[in-house]
Each structure stands twice: as C-alpha cells, then as structure tokens.
Amino acid sequence: IAFLWSIVNSPTFPNTVEKNYCNLPKECLVKKKFWGFLPEHHVFHLYNGRKNRKLFDEGIHALADVPEDKLSNAQQVIQLNCAKTGKIHIDKEKIKEFLTTLDKVECHLDFETCSFALPEFNGTRPYQRLPFQFSLHVINNGTKKHFEYLHDGKDDPRPTFLAALKEMLPLDGSVVVYSQGFETSVLRELARDFPEYASWVNGVLKRIVDLRVPFSNFWYYNPIQHGSASIKKVLP
C-alpha cells in the first residue's frame, strides 16, 4: 500500500513496470504511456515466450532482433522469420493433413454462457458457466444451413439449451469448435448435471475437432497476429 501511495503522490510516472500485468484484469489506461516506444512487432509478442522480459532487459526490443539461439520452439522460429520478412507463413501440407480429419458433414458450433457470483438456480455453483445460446452451421456436400438457439426467459437455460442442441445437431459428422477447452468443459458439466443426456453428450465430445490447431501450430501465421492464435487475432 505504501508503494502504491508513493506512486499516486509522485509528480512523475514510475519506471517501466512488468508488462504481464498491463492487461489484467483489463488493459491499463496508461499502457501506451509506458510502452509506446516499443515497435509494432516487439519482443513481448514472442509466442509462449517465458524469457521475454529477460530479452527486453538485455536491450532487445524488436522481435526481429531476437537471436535465433534464444528461440525455444518451432512457432517462435516461424514468428521471427515472418517479423523479418513481413510475409505470411503457410504450411499447405500440414493444413491439408488437418482437413482430412474432418468428416463429410461439418457442424461448426459456438456457445455463449453466463455466470453469477450468487447462484441463480438450484444445483449450480458460484461463477458456473451456464450456456444460454448456441450458433450451429452445418456444411454437407457444399450446402450450408444455419441453426441457432437463444434462451428467452428467467429460468435455468440449460434444459432447453440441451434439448435444442440435441434436436438440431446432426447425429454424425465432425463437431468443429475453436479452442475446444471451452465447449468441451461446458458439455462435460452439462453431462454431469443432466445425466439423462450424458450418453449423447459423450458421443458429441468424441466428434469434436479443434479448428485452433492449425493456427496454434502456426501452420498458418500472419505477422499481424502478434504471436497469438486467439480467435480475436485470427478472425480478422
């Protein structure tokens, strides 16, 4: 507390602070004041870079200036080359191999959830993710169909969410999601809380294909991603 008060009462900004905290829990209002000197592709963008701060302290600010012997994985090598050339990296063979894992029918699925500090419904826990909406695009033989569900009411959305998903989701085909950890964990919680759906949910889980894989492995990488495979960076 004393340290914080010293900053508040100081007529000048403190020295540059640890960048890892500048976006938590949300982006700092004076982030650009501290870090505006960094180039567009800077060392803190290095993918999975546990030594980013050390590199910065050694005077390495630009990503293109990072020595190759400081890199620790294949993604960093790709990222460094893209930073130097400004070109997009595409591994067509790896992407083709990934696409062969998709079934003839593709079910592209996305959930939206809400959570409450104080549980709203019986049998739920604080901050438990409760799905209330889904978007489903089904591709079959070149044709596309869109299905959706949005809960309308103040009651527990999960029973009707599950019923609608079971009705609209095809019985076979790949269930394609982006960053599968979210959807799979929500589905597992639903199977636990609604055991009558457990067998069906477990069948869906076995069909999930994670579209994030080609991007997290940098089989496709654009320098504007800044070392991230999040959908917010990939989608544009």
What is the predicted role of each segment?
Residues 42, 46-105:
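N-terminal accessory regions of nucleic-acid-interacting proteins
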Residues 94-171, 192:
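Conserved RNase H-like, two-metal-ion catalytic cores of nucleic-acid enzymes
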Residues 1-12:
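Internal, well-ordered domain-core segments that constitute the primary functional module
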Residues 1-2, 146-236:
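Conserved DEDDh/DEDDy metal-dependent 3′-5′ exonuclease domain
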Residues 10-42:
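Cysteine-cluster motifs in flexible loop/terminal segments that predominantly coordinate metals
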Residues 17-18, 23, 27-29, 108, ...:
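A structural signal for short, well-ordered beta-strand segments and their strand-loop junctions
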Residues 33, 111-114, 139-141, 180-182, ...:
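An acidic- and aromatic-residue-enriched active-site/binding cleft used to recognize and process polar
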